[in-house]
Every structure is written in structure tokens, then in C-alpha cells.
């Protein structure tokens, strides 16, 4: 049985992503594969190339033939040189710089805006703020209503006859 190491396509229309697969030479491009040994994402910068070197060496040693695109990928990772015994087995694979974490970016933005990092959220939660305000307003309503009712009675009594009205609040 002739075995090939080839690319099987995944992804969207203009965003191809490939798996590096070992399959029978007679199967179609995205057909059944014997083993998946890596992946390749050409649209990323730099391109993502991950190949399980141990499995690639095994399949090359038992006679699997890489297709032209896979051969180029194997040369980039250094697996082809390692298999053939050529110099340059370390490969010339470019690695993307590590991305800063979101927490570091957040703390840096806070430091620029205010002057120092804090662990608290920028704004309090809406539910907590509204429920606390409602409770405070409900507690203040009966007190405010009682004081408002007492003031008009006291103001109206001296205006009528000049007599001092006895307030019911004193007893």
C-alpha cells in the first residue's frame, strides 16, 4: 500500500487551515486518513506549523512519501533534514512573540488613566447600586411623609386665629 503524507483542508472560504495527515495515496484530499501528525495555518503571521516530529520520522522511515507542500513544511521544521541526515536539522521555523495577558493590558491601561493599578472594577454593578438605592429610598419615604404632614398643620393653625395649635406629635 502506497502511503502519502499530505494536507487535508479545513477552515472557511478565504481562511484555509490544514491538517498534516498520513493517508493512502488513492484517497481523496479530505478523505479518510490513517493518522494526523500535525497542523498548518498559513494565514496567521507568522504561519503556524506544528508537526509531531517523532511520528513524522516514523512514517518517513516506513516509506511514506510527502507531497510537495508537506516536503516544504518538513524542511522548515527541520524534520526532513533530520530524516536524511543533512545539516540544519534545527529548522528555520519562525515563532510568534508571546501575547500579553488581558490582565496585564488592563492594569497597564489603569496605570495610564489614573496612576496606579487596582483590583476593583471601574464601575459598581448596576444591580447592587439600584437595589441599595431603592432600599434607602423606601426607608426614607415614611419619615419624609410624616415630617411633611406635620409641617402644614403647624403652619396653618397660627394663620387662622392667632392661637397656638397643639401638635399631636408632642403627646
UniProtKB/Swiss-Prot annotation:
GO terms for cellular component: cytoplasm; small ribosomal subunit. Coiled coil: none annotated. Disulfide bonds: none annotated. Residues 142-171 have a biased composition (Low complexity). Residues 114-171 are annotated as: Disordered. Keywords: Ribonucleoprotein, Ribosomal protein. Pfam families: Ribosomal_S16. The keyword Ligase does not apply. GO terms for biological process: translation. GO terms for molecular function: structural constituent of ribosome. PANTHER family: 30S RIBOSOMAL PROTEIN S16, SMALL RIBOSOMAL SUBUNIT PROTEIN BS16M. Belongs to the bacterial ribosomal protein bS16 family. This is Small ribosomal subunit protein bS16. It comes from Mycolicibacterium paratuberculosis (strain ATCC BAA-968 / K-10).
